[in-house]
C-alpha cells in the first residue's frame, strides 16, 4: 500500500497560489493616468507583493541550467486581466528529455516514508476580487445551482469542454478550384487585374452616399437658473440621452463658465465635448455675420478661456480633491485639442510659457501638462516652441540642482530630469542654444553623469559639439584649442601663493597635460627663465617640480641638457635663471656634475667663445655657476682642469672667495664670535661675483649663523640671491628669544613670502615663529616691534584666528600700559609747552605725549607737525638715532585713531599741494613702519591730489609727482629717516603694494606720467622715459600682466593722447617685449614692428604683443587713414604667414583687438572669403574641383581671423551686401552639386569633397554673422538665404556627408530664430508648391500642412451654354494651395470661415445635383456608364449604385464568366496599360482603373475631354459639427458634408 504524501510537502499537490500568480509591476512603474507618480497601488496586498521563491529541494543543489521554474517570476506572464487561482500541472510525457530534473521531484516510495512534515501555519490567502464590468455583473461567473449546463458532467462535456462556437452554415465550396486553373496560365495576371478592378468598382459603388447635408445645430434656449442646473445634472447622467437634451440647450454657457460647469458637475468627457461643440457652432454662426474677423476673434477667445480654465484649476493645488479636478481639466483640454477645437499655435505657445513662469511648487503639475503625449509631440516638433520648452527646463534645472545638494531629491526634480533627458534623446535640435549653452551645458553633463546613461551621454556630447560649432567667438575669451605648453603656463601662472602649494598635485596636473617628460621639462624651464615673467619664486618652484618628477622616474638631467642645446631660450630667456636652477639641483644631488663634465669632454664643448657672456658659451658657464660644496675632490679637480683653458680662472675664483669672506667678517663680526671687534662698513658688489662664489658665501654664512643664532643680519644672503639658504638661516634664528631677532624674522618672512611658499618653507617657519611668540608671552610681555611685525605677517598669511586674537589682545594691553593715568586731557597741560614753538627737543615731545589721555583734532595736528619738524632736524643734522620717532607716531595715534587718520590725511594733502617733497620723504617711511598709515592710503591720497591738480590746471604738484611715486616703488636704497629694521619693514610694505595688491599702482604710474608730461617743460620727457624703463616698473608691469592682461590698457585710460606720452609708453613696451634689444623695435618702421611682434609672439608674451599692436595702430591712426590701411594689410600678411608656419600664437594676437582696428581686419578678411568663393557664380563647373581645393584652405584661414576679430555689428550697407553675396554663393553651391553629379562614394566618405569644404567654410561665416545680418535685412533677403540653404540641405548629393547636412540644418535652425513671421509664411508657401513638406521643414519654419490637406474636392467644370459670367469671388478665393493652412495666412478661425463659404457654394450646386441624383455616376469613369463593355456580357456590366444588388449565386456566376473572358483576352494588351484614361486624380485617388480597349466614339471622346476640365480646392472638415448624436433619423446625412461634391472622387 502506498501512502499518500501529506498536503504541503515538497513535490506534491498543486503549486501554490503565489507560484502561478503573475508578478506585480515593479516599484518604480507609474500607474497610467495618475497625477502623482509616487502614489502607491491601492490594490490588495495579495496583488502587490511578489512572493518569495520556493527554497530548493534538499539533497541536491539547484543548478543553473535547471529547466524548472525557480520562482514565480520564471513563469510565463499572461496578458489577461484575471488569472485562475490554481493551474494543474501537466504530467510528463513518456521519454521526456527533462529526466535530469526528476531528482528534484519528490518520489512516492512503496510503504511510505514514515515521516510527515509538520503542518506550517501561514497567513490565509485572500481570494482576489473578480473583475467587474458595467452592468454590475461578474464576467463569466455563474453561482453554482446544479442546474446549469456546465455543471452537469457528460461524456461530450468532458471530452470537448464548453465553448461558444458560432452557428454558421456549411460553405458549398471554395473559389480556389475554379480560379486556380485560370490564374496559373498566361492570362492569369490579366484576369486577376480584371477581378481587382471589378472589386474596387463594386466597393466604391456600395460605399457612396447620396443624401445631401441636412445638419442643423441644436438650438439654445434661455432658461431659468434652476432649469439650467437641472439640465446640467441631466447631462451629467449617462442614462439621459443626448437626443432629448439637444432640444433644450440652455443659453449663457460659454467660455470658461461652460468648462467650470463641466468640471463642477463632473460631466462625462464625451458629453462635455458634445456640449462644447453645440455651443461652439452656435457661437460661430452668430459671429459669422461680422465676417471672418468675428470667427477669428471668437476662436482666440475660446482658446484663452480654455487656458484660463486650466490655469485656475492648477492654482487650486493642495485644496480638497485637487488631483481629481486637475485630472478632469487636463483630460477635457486634451480632448478639445485632439478634436482641433482650439487655436493650436496659441495653445501650444501658452504651455511652455506657463512652464517657464511657474513656481517651484507648481512645477510638477506643469511638467505633467507638458508630458501629455499630444502636447509634447507637437511642442517638440516645432523649433519656436521646442526652444522655449528647452530653455524652461534648463532654467528650472539650474534653480533646483543646488537645492538638491542640500536636501533630498524631490519628485518634481526627478520628473524634470526625465523630461529633459527625453528631450535630449528624442528632439536634440530643440537644445541648439548657442547663446545660453555655455551656461547650461555643465548642469546637463552632470545630470547625465549622475544617471549613468552612456547613450544619453553620447547624445549630450554630440549636442555640445553642435552648439560649439554654432558659437561665435567670445571676446577676450580663452581659445579652446590651446597647446599643451600654453595650458602648463596657465597652470603655473595661476598658482595661489597666499595658500600652501601642494607640489604633488601640481606635478601630476602638469603631467596630465603633457606626458612626455623631456617636453614637459623644456616647458617648465621656458616658463622659469622667460624674460616676460618676474620673481625669484620661479627658480625654486621649478626646482621642486623637477625634483618631484625625478623621484617619479623622469630623467631630469637629460631634459635640461636637451633644452639648453635647443637654444630656444636665447631670444626670450635669462641664462642666469637656468643656471641657478641647475645649481639648486646640484645641491640636492638631482643633477650630476661629474656626468656633465664627462659630456663636456665627449662633445668638445669647451672650445667655445672666449667671453662667457655669449649665449653659445653656456656649456662652460654652467660649471662656473655650480656650488662646490658637496662635490668630490675628483670632480673639483676635473672642473679646475677644464677651466684652465677658458676665460674663467679657478685661482682668481678662490682668491675672490677669500676676500669676500674677510670683508663680511669685518662687517658683521658678531656672526663669527668677534663681538669685541668694531664693525666696518664695506660695500661689496655681489653682482660681479660668479654664481659659484655667491653660493659658497651663502653656505658659509649659514654655518656661521648656526653657531651664533642671536645675530640679526639677512642682507648678505639677499644680495647673494640665495633664498633657500636664507630660509635655513631663518629656521635657525627662529629659535632665539631675542624679540628684535624674531621681529626681523617676521619681516623677512613677509617680504619673501612668495619665494618661501615656492620653496615650501613658509608654513613651517611661520609655525615655529608662532610657537616662539607663545613661549615669550609666558615669560614677559612682547615688545611693540615684535607685535607690529608679527601682526603684519599674520594679516597677510591669514593663519588660524586664535593667533590674530592674541596679537590684537597684546596690542590693546600695550596701549593701556603706555597710557599715563592722568585725569586732565593733554590740551590742558600744553599751553606752556606750545608757547615755545621753536623748541622741539626729544624731552619736550616725550612730555607732551605723556601729559594726558586725550587730545582734540587741533592739538593733534600741532603735535604731528612738531614730530615731523623734530624728525627733519635729526635728518638735517645727521643724527642716526631714529628709534623714537616711529614709537612717537604710534603713541600719538593711540589717542584717537579716527582723528589721527583725518589729521594725517589733511597734512599729507597740504604737503603734496605745497610741494614739500623733503618733508614727505622724511615722514612717510617712519609713519608706514610704525603701522600708523598704510602705504595704499598714501597711494589713494596721491592719486586724488594729482587728479585735482590736473582738473584745476595746477602744475606745481607735477614737479614732485615722480619723486612721490618713487616713495611707493621698492628700491635698493634704505630710508634715511628711520632705522634699518624700520627701513626693511617699509620696503616690505612697498613690495606688498606693488606686487601683491591690485592694479592701482599701474593706474598711478600712468596718471603721474600723464601729469608730468602735460607740463611745458621738455626735460620731463627724459625723466618719465627713464622711470617707465626702470627695472622696478618693468617688474611691476610683468607681474600684473600675468593676472590682468588689460593692465597696460588701464595705464593709458584717461590720457589726453599727447605724442610725448605715446613716446614714453612705447619705451615701456619696448622694454617689456624686447629687454635685450635684439628686435630693435625703437629703430624700425611700424610695418616692420608688426612683423617683429608677430615673430616674438608666444604664449608668455601674448598680452605684451597685443598691447604693442594696439599702440602701433593707435599711433598711426593719428597720422592718416592710409597708414592704418597699410598696417591692416601688414597684419593680415603676418597672420597668413603665421598660418602657413602653423604658429597659433600669431592668431591669438587678434583676440583682444578692439574698435576700428578689429573691424578693418575683419572686413578685409570677409572680402577675401567672398572673393575666394567667387568662382561659384560663373555657372560652369569646369575646373571647379581644383578651385575648391585651393579655396577651402584659404577660407579656413580667413575664417579664423574673422572669428578672432568678431565684435560689433557691421554697418547696414555692409550687411546687405554680405547677405546677398552669401545667398549667391549658396545658390552656386547648389548648382555645382547638381552639375557635378555624385561627390563621392561610400569608400571615400572620410575625405571631404572640395565643394563640401567650401560649403562648410561659408556655413561658419553665416553662423557667426547670420543673426546680425537677418535682424536688419529685408524680408526678401531673409527668404532668399533661407530657401538657398534649404535647397542645399535636401540635395541628394549630400547624403554621403551627414555631418554637412547636420551643419546646414543647425545653421538653418539658428537663422530661423531671427526671421519674421511673414518670411516663415512665404517660405512655407514655397515649400508647399514644391511638395516637399517634411518634418524637417516643419520643425524649422513651424509651418505644417493642414490637418485636412488630404481632403481635396474635385468639381467638374462644364462649359456653360450661356455667355460666361464673371467667376464667383468665393470660388476663386478657395482655389488655393492644397497645403495652405490657417496658420499660413495668420487666420486662426479660417476653417470655420472656409466652411461657411463651402456651404454657400453647395447651395448653388444643390438643385442640379438633386435633379441628377438618381442617374449620377463617377465622371472619371464615364465610359463604364456611357457605353457597354464589348468583352463582357450584359449581365456583368457594372450597375449604378441605385440598382438592386445581385444575389450571392448570381455574383458567383458573373465571376466565372469574367474568368472565361479573361482567358480569351490573354493575347490582347493589358487594360491596365492601354485603357487607363488620363484624368485629373486627386491625392489619395486612383485615377482611371479599367475600361474598354476599343476606340472611343466621338461622343465619348468629347465627353471625356469635357470631364477633364475640373477644379480642385481644399476641403476643411467642420470639426465643430461632428456631433455624437443629433436626431433620430438614421437616413439623414448629418456629417455637415455635402456628399455631392465627392462625385468625382474614389475612396
UniProtKB/Swiss-Prot annotation:
Record keyword Glycoprotein present: no
SUPFAM superfamilies assigned to the protein according to its UniProt record, in alphabetical order: ARM repeat (SSF48371)
Keyword Transcription: yes
Ranges of biased composition (kind: Pro residues): 1357-1369
Subcellular location: Nucleus
GO CC field: mediator complex
Biased composition (Low complexity): 1398-1413, 1446-1468
Family from the record: Belongs to the Mediator complex subunit 12 family.
Keywords in alphabetical order: Activator, Nucleus, Repressor, Transcription, Transcription regulation
GO MF term list: transcription coactivator activity
Pfam families per record: ARM_SRB8, Med12
Subunit comment: Component of the SRB8-11 complex, which itself associates with the Mediator complex.
Primary location recorded for the protein, binned into one broad class: nucleus
Annotated stretches, region: Disordered: 1-63, 1356-1509
Protein function: Component of the SRB8-11 complex. The SRB8-11 complex is a regulatory module of the Mediator complex which is itself involved in regulation of basal and activated RNA polymerase II-dependent transcription. The SRB8-11 complex may be involved in the transcriptional repression of a subset of genes regulated by Mediator. It may inhibit the association of the Mediator complex with RNA polymerase II to form the holoenzyme complex.
Protein name from the UniProt record: Mediator of RNA polymerase II transcription subunit 12
One example of a Gene Ontology biological process annotation: positive regulation of transcription by RNA polymerase II
Polar residues: compositionally biased ranges: 1379-1390, 1469-1480, 1499-1509
Amino acid at each position: 500500500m502506498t501512502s499518500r504524501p501529506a498536503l504541503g510537502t515538497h513535490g506534491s499537490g498543486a503549486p501554490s497560489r503565489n507560484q502561478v500568480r503573475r508578478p506585480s509591476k515593479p516599484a518604480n512603474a507609474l500607474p497610467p493616468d495618475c497625477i502623482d507618480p509616487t502614489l502607491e497601488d491601492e490594490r490588495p496586498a495579495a496583488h502587490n507583493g511578489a512572493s518569495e521563491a520556493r527554497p530548493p529541494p534538499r539533497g541536491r543543489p539547484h543548478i543553473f541550467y535547471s529547466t524548472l521554474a525557480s520562482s514565480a517570476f520564471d513563469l510565463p506572464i499572461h496578458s489577461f486581466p484575471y488569472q485562475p487561482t490554481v493551474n494543474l500541472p501537466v504530467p510528463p510525457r513518456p521519454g521526456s528529455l527533462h529526466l535530469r530534473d526528476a531528482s528534484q521531484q519528490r518520489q512516492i516510495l512503496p510503504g511510505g516514508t514514515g515521516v510527515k512534515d509538520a503542518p506550517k501555519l501561514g497567513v490565509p490567502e485572500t481570494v482576489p476580487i473578480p473583475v467587474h464590468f458595467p452592468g454590475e455583473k461578474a464576467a463569466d461567473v455563474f453561482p453554482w445551482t446544479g442546474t446549469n449546463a456546465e455543471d452537469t458532467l457528460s461524456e461530450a462535456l468532458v471530452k470537448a469542454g464548453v465553448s461558444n462556437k458560432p452557428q454558421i452554415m456549411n460553405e458549398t465550396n471554395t473559389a480556389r478550384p475554379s480560379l486556380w486553373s485560370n490564374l496559373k496560365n498566361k492570362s492569369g495576371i490579366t484576369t486577376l487585374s480584371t477581378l481587382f478592378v471589378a472589386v474596387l468598382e463594386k466597393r466604391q459603388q456600395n460605399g457612396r452616399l447620396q443624401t445631401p447635408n441636412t445638419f442643423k445645430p441644436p438650438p439654445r434656449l434661455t432658461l431659468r437658473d434652476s432649469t439650467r442646473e437641472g439640465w446640467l445634472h441631466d447631462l451629467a447622467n449617462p442614462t439621459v440621452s443626448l437626443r432629448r437634451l439637444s432640444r433644450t440647450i440652455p443659453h449663457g454657457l460659454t467660455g470658461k463658465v461652460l468648462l467650470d460647469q463641466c468640471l463642477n458637475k463632473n460631466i462625462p468627457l464625451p458629453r462635455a465635448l458634445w456640449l462644447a461643440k453645440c455651443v461652439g457652432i452656435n457661437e460661430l454662426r452668430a459671429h459669422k455675420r461680422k465676417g471672418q474677423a468675428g470667427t477669428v476673434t471668437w476662436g482666440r477667445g475660446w482658446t484663452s478661456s480654455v487656458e484660463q480654465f486650466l490655469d485656475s484649476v492648477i492654482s487650486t493645488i493642495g485644496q480638497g480633491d485637487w488631483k481629481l479636478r486637475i485630472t478632469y481639466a487636463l483630460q477635457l483640454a486634451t480632448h478639445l485639442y485632439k478634436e482641433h477645437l482650439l487655436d493650436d499655435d496659441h495653445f501650444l505657445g501658452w504651455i511652455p510659457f506657463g512652464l517657464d513662469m511657474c513656481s517651484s511648487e507648481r512645477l510638477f503639475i506643469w511638467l505633467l501638462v507638458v508630458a501629455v503625449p499630444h502636447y509634447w509631440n507637437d511642442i517638440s516638433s516645432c523649433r519656436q516652441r521646442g526652444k522655449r520648452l528647452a530653455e524652461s527646463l534648463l532654467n528650472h534645472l539650474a534653480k533646483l540642482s543646488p537645492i538638491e545638494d542640500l536636501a533630498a531629491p524631490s519628485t518634481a526634480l526627478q520628473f524634470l530630469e526625465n523630461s529633459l533627458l527625453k528631450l535630449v534623446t528624442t528632439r536634440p535640435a530643440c537644445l541648439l542654444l548657442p547663446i545660453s549653452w555655455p551656461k547650461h551645458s555643465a548642469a546637463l553633463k552632470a545630470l547625465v553623469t549622475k544617471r549613468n546613461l552612456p547613450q544619453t551621454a553620447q547624445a549630450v556630447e554630440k549636442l555640445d559639439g553642435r552648439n560649439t560649432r554654432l558659437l561665435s567667438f567670445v571676446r577676450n575669451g580663452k581659445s579652446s584649442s590651446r597647446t599643451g605648453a600654453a595650458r602648463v603656463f596657465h597652470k603655473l601662472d595661476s598658482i595661489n601663493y597666499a595658500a600652501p602649494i601642494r607640489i604633488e598635485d601640481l606635478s601630476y596636473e602638469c603631467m596630465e597635460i603633457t606626458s612626455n617628460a623631456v617636453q614637459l621639462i623644456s616647458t617648465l624651464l621656458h616658463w622659469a627663465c622667460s624674460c616676460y615673467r618676474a620673481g625669484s619664486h620661479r627658480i625654486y618652484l621649478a626646482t621642486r617640480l623637477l625634483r618631484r618628477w625625478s623621484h617619479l622616474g623622469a630623467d631630469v638631467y637629460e631634459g635640461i641638457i636637451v633644452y639648453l642645446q635647443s637654444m630656444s631660450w636665447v631670444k626670450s630667456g635669462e641664462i642666469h635663471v637656468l643656471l641657478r636652477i641647475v645649481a639648486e639641483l646640484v645641491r640636492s644631488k638631482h643633477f650630476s656634475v661629474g656626468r656633465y663634465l664627462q659630456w663636456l669632454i665627449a662633445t668638445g664643448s669647451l672650445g667655445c667663445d672666449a667671453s662667457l657672456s655669449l649665449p653659445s658659451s653656456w656649456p662652460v658657464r654652467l660649471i662656473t655657476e655650480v656650488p662646490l660644496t658637496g662635490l668630490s675632490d675628483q670632480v673639483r679637480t676635473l672642473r679646475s682642469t677644464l677651466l684652465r683653458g677658458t676665460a674663467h680662472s679657478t685661482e682668481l675664483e678662490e682668491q675672490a672667495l677669500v676676500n669676500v669672506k674677510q670683508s663680511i667678517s669685518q662687517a658683521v663680526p658678531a656672526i663669527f664670535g668677534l663681538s669685541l671687534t668694531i664693525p666696518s662698513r664695506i660695500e661689496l658688489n655681489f653682482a660681479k661675483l660668479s654664481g659659484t662664489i655667491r653660493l659658497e658665501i651663502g653656505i658659509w654664512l649659514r654655518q656661521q649663523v648656526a653657531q651664533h643664532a642671536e645675530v640679526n643680519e639677512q642682507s648678505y644672503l639677499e644680495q647673494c640671491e640665495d633664498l633657500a639658504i636664507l630660509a635655513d638661516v631663518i629656521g635657525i634664528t627662529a629659535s632665539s628669544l631675542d624679540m628684535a631677532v624674531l621681529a626681523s624674522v617676521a619681516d623677512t618672512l613677509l617680504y619673501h613670502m612668495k619665494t618661501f611658499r615656492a620653496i615650501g618653507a613658509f608654513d613651517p617657519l611661520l609655525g615655529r615663529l608662532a610657537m616662539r611668540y607663545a613661549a615669550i608671552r609666558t615669560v614677559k610681555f612682547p615688545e611693540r616691534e615684535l607685535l607690529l611685525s608679527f601682526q603684519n605677517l599674520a594679516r597677510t598669511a591669514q593663519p588660524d584666528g586664535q593667533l590674530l586674537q592674541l596679537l590684537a589682545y597684546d596690542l590693546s594691553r600695550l596701549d593701556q600700559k603706555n597710557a599715563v593715568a592722568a585725569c586732565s586731557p593733554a590740551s590742558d597741560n600744553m599751553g606752556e609747552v606750545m608757547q615755545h614753538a621753536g623748541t622741539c627737543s626729544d624731552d619736550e615731545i616725550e612730555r607732551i605725549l605723556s601729559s594726558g589721555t586725550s587730545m582734540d583734532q587741533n592739538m593733534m595736528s600741532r603735535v604731528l607737525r612738531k614730530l615731523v619738524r623734530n624728525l627733519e632736524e635729526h635728518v638735517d643734522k645727521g643724527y642716526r638715532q631714529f628709534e623714537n620717532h616711529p614709537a612717537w607716531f604710534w603713541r600719538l595715534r593711540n589717542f584717537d585713531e579716527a582723528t589721527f587718520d583725518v589729521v594725517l590725511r589733511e597734512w599729507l594733502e597740504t604737503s603734496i599741494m605745497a610741494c614739500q617733497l623733503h618733508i614727505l620723504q622724511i615722514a612717510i617711511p617712519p609713519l608706514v613702519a610704525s603701522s600708523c598709515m598704510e602705504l595704499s592710503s598714501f597711494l589713494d591720497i596721491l592719486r586724488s591730489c594729482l587728479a585735482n591738480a590736473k582738473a584745476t590746471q595746477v602744475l606745481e604738484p607735477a614737479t614732485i609727482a615722480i619723486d612721490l611715486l618713487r616713495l611707493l616703488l621698492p628700491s635698493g636704497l634704505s630710508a634715511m629717516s628711520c632705522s634699518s629694521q624700520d627701513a626693511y619693514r617699509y620696503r616690505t610694505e612697498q613690495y606688498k603694494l606693488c606686487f601683491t595688491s591690485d592694479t592701482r599702482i599701474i593706474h598711478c604710474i600712468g596718471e603721474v606720467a600723464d601729469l608730468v608730461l602735460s607740463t611745458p617743460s621738455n626735460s620731463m620727457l627724459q625723466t618719465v622715459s627713464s622711470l617707465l624703463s626702470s627695472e622696478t616698473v618693468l617688474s611691476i608691469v610683468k607681474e600684473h600682466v600675468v593676472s590682468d592682461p588689460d593692465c597696460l590698457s588701464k595705464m593709458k585710460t584717461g590720457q589726453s593722447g599727447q605724442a610725448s606720452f605715446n613716446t614714453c609708453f612705447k619705451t615701456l613696451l619696448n622694454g617689456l617685449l624686447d629687454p635685450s634689444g635684439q628686435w630693435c623695435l625703437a629703430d624700425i618702421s611700424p610695418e616692420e614692428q608688426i612683423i617683429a611682434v608677430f615673430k616674438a609672439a608666444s604664449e608668455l608674451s601674448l598680452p605684451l604683443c597685443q598691447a604693442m599692436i594696439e599702440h602701433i595702430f593707435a599711433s598711426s591712426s593719428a597720422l592718416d587713414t592710409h597708414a592704418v590701411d597699410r598696417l591692416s594689410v601688414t597684419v593680415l600678411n603676418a597672420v597668413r604667414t603665421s598660418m602657413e608656419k602653423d604658429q597659433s600664437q600669431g592668431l591669438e594676437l587678434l583676440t583682444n583687438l578692439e574698435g576700428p582696428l578689429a573691424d578693418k581686419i575683419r572686413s578685409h578678411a570677409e572680402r577675401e572669403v567672398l572673393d575666394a568663393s567667387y568662382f561659384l557664380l560663373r555657372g560652369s563647373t569646369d575646373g571647379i574641383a581644383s578651385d575648391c581645393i585651393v579655396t577651402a584652405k584659404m577660407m579656413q584661414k580667413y575664417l579664423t581671423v574673422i572669428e578672432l576679430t568678431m565684435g560689433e555689428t557691421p554697418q547696414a550697407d555692409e550687411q546687405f551686401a554680405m547677405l546677398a553675396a552669401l545667398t549667391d554663393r549658396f545658390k552656386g553651391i547648389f548648382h555645382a552639386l547638381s552639375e557635378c553629379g555624385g561627390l563621392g562614394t561610400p569608400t571615400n566618405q572620410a575625405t571631404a569633397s572640395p565643394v563640401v569644404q567650401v560649403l562648410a567654410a561659408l556655413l561658419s561665416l553665416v553662423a557667426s554673422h547670420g543673426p546680425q545680418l537677418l535682424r536688419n535685412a529685408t524680408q526678401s533677403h531673409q527668404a532668399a538665404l533661407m530657401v538657398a540653404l534649404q535647397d542645399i540641405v535636401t540635395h541628394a548629393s549630400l547624403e554621403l556627408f551627414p555631418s554637412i547636412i547636420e551643419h546646414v540644418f543647425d545653421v538653418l535652425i539658428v537663422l530661423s530664430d531671427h526671421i519674421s513671421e511673414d518670411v516663415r509664411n512665404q517660405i512655407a508657401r514655397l515649400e508647399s508648391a514644391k511638395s516637399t513638406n517634411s518634418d524637417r521643414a516643419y520643425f524649422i519654419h513651424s509651418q505644417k500642412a493642414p490637418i485636412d490637406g488630404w481632403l481635396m474636392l474635385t468639381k467638374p467644370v462644364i462649359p456653360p451654354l450661356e455667355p460666361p459670367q464673371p467667376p464667383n469671388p468665393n470660388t476663386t478665393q478657395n482655389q488655393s494651395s492644397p497645403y495652405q493652412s490657417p496658420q499660413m495666412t495668420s487666420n486662426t478661425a479660417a476653417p470655420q470661415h472656409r466652411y461657411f463659404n463651402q456651404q454657400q457654394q453647395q447651395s448653388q450646386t444643390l438643385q442640379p445635383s438633386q435633379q441628377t441624383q438618381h442617374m449620377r455616376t463617377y465622371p472619371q469613369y464615364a465610359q463604364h456608364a456611357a457605353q457597354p463593355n464589348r468583352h463582357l456580357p450584359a449581365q456583368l456590366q457594372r450597375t449604378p449604385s441605385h440598382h438592386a444588388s445581385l444575389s450571392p449565386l448570381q455574383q458567383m456566376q458573373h465571376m466565372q464568366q469574367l474568368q472565361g473572358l479573361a482567358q480569351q483576352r490573354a493575347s490582347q494588351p493589358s487594360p491596365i496599360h492601354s485603357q487607363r484614361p488620363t484624368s485629373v486624380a486627386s491625392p489619395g485617388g486612383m485615377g482611371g482603373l479599367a475600361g474598354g480597349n476599343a476606340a472611343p466614339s466621338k461622343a465619348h471622346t468629347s465627353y471625356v475631354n469635357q470631364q477633364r476640365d475640373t477644379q480642385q480646392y481644399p476641403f476643411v472638415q467642420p470639426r465643430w459639427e461632428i456631433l455624437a448624436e443629433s436626431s433620430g433619423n438614421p437616413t439623414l446625412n448629418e456629417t455637415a458634408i455635402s456628399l455631392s461634391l465627392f462625385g468625382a472622387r474614389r475612396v
